[in-house]
Every structure is written in C-alpha cells, then in structure tokens.
Amino acid sequence: MVLKVKMGDIGVGKSPESIETLLGSCVAIILYDKGKKIGGLAHVMLPKSRMQKEKNPGKYVDTAIPELITKIVKMGARKDRLTVKLAGGAAMFGNNSNNIDVGKKNIEASKIEIKKIGLRVSSEDLGGDTGRTITLSLKDGSVMVRKGSELKTI
C-alpha cells in the first residue's frame, strides 16, 4: 500500500508499506527506524509556526518534527535508532531578489530543528529549481527521488 502525504501533512507507517509525496519548495522530513521498519514523513510548507500550532502541526518545521517523532514512537519506533533524510526545498519561483526563497528557509530550519533534538541527517536531496516526487520504502528506509526523468535513491 502507498500512503500519499499532502502538503502540510504527516504520514506514518510500517513495512511493507511506502509513503509518497510531491515536493516543490516544501521539504520532506523523513524519519525511519531500521530495526522496527517503522517510519514517517512530514511534508512541511513553512519554517516556523507563529499561531495555530495545534491546528496543523505538519505544516511547520518546528512543530512537524516533534509530532512525527511522537507518531512513530507510538507505533513502536525508538527515537535513539532513527535515521533522518531530507528532500525538497527547491527555488520554484527563480532567484529574483523580490522573492523570498521559501525552499532555502525550509531547508535551513529543518537542519536546525533536527540538530536541536540530537539527531543528524544521514542523506539528502535538497535545493535546485525543480520539484520532485519522493517515495519512502518502509521495507528498508530507502527514499526514491524522481526529478523529471532523473531517478535516484538516497
């Protein structure tokens, strides 16, 4: 079964499922426990929550990460065994000085928050100017990244 995660949402599951999302400037924060074959993905849209944190914790980097950890730990994952992968954060609107590079800000915030909770990023596919589709296999924790006709695993 493939669980599709929408913008601002969080999806969790266990082997043999997979989790998929489509990214532009948003970032996918992927956590996986190899021992239990449990993982999840947060499709974050913005770096920081200001108001209404409880309403949609998956929308913001600073609220999505703790929520994702809580959800997968409830399924049986162990925080001390989690691997972290990041994908997305494209500059979808060019590098015009009038535009705020939301993708870059999402990337920076994701790395800061991951470090704050004592985890580190094991692999990533970030930036650029092209959207991507990612699929997390909960069988082995691999993440397939598709950008146009380009396909790679992180």
Swiss-Prot record:
The lineage of its organism: Archaea, Methanobacteriati, Methanobacteriota, Methanomada group, Methanococci. HAMAP family: CheD (MF_01440). Coiled coil: none annotated. One of its GO terms (molecular function) is protein-glutamine glutaminase activity. The keyword Amino-acid biosynthesis does not apply. It is an enzyme of class 3 (hydrolase). One of its GO terms (biological process) is chemotaxis. It catalyses: L-glutaminyl-[protein] + H2O = L-glutamyl-[protein] + NH4(+). It comes from Methanococcus maripaludis (strain C5 / ATCC BAA-1333). Keywords: Chemotaxis, Hydrolase. This is Probable chemoreceptor glutamine deamidase CheD. Belongs to the CheD family.
